[in-house]
Amino acid sequence: MSEFTLEPLYDYPQREQVLALARTHADAVDRGERSPFENLREIAKDGLITLGRDGGSLVPQVSVAFDLATEDASTAFSLWAHRSTIAFFDAVGRELPAGLADATVSGTTAMAAAYKEASGLAPIKVEGTLVEGGLKLNGSVSWASNLYPGGVIVLPVAVQNAPESHPNRYIVTVRQDVEGLSIDYHRNLLALNGTESGTLKFEDVFVPSEDVLSDNIEAFLHDVTAPFLLVQSSFCLGLAAGALQEAAKHLDVSQGVFRPEFPLILAEYQSLREELVRLASEPARAERRDLLSLRLGVSHFATIATHFELQVVGGAGYV
């Protein structure tokens, strides 16, 4: 008998339709026969990919990502990258490029390098050179997702020839099919096969001045970290919740050898769930340390939960 009930983070009116949509198309998305953006366009009709843009609670938005992840990891992951891109434009008070709000144009976040450099882990690998009317980009981004033709990409750039005492780190936006940008797509990805992920290579890509979103990378990261990490955390927690739901159906296999572990795992799940809702309720007041701690915690927990599911469900073959 199941000892785990998958409760919503927030019971929005369209929840059952979202779950049914993800469940129905999960296999086709994973096989590459259906784009996650077909799902996102469906839920965008009800405004479910632009929740919380007013700076208030992000609980409804993280709830949608959580629910998608319990059924379809690729669509939930694509929502995170797309919603983060929307947050980047909101953070600098820019109007959204046409198509982002209804997912007819994809949004790609290539911001990992900015966070790595801010943490002292690695430098930004895309370099910019100031030229008349803008700058030219050269370098690479090792991983980005939602790489569809015409898509909107946001990334950090290390400017090499900035005047002394001027900012030398920019946040810029480019289109996926801009001249000089090539993509090496990653295929056969575990759980994320439908996300159109790949490596970006920039060769003299011109960015006009109006496509520089910010030259204050510290302030920019401060403003976008909450939506960026909270939606990402909800994706991880939803993936874990889906694994626990499946494992709970098989706790009596192999003479119930795995059953004693389950209450401990559930306690950790409940703790992370409560912290996610707490931080998402007032994202503007969330401390960076708490956001990072949650993100690391749910990532680790997703590994534990999926491994537990593999043990328990796999054990059914030995009954």
For every predicted segment, state its role.
Residues 187-270:
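Glycine-rich beta->alpha junctions and the first turn(s) of the following alpha-helix
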Residues 105, 122-124, 149-151, 168, ...:
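A generic structural signal for well-ordered coil/turn residues at beta-strand boundaries
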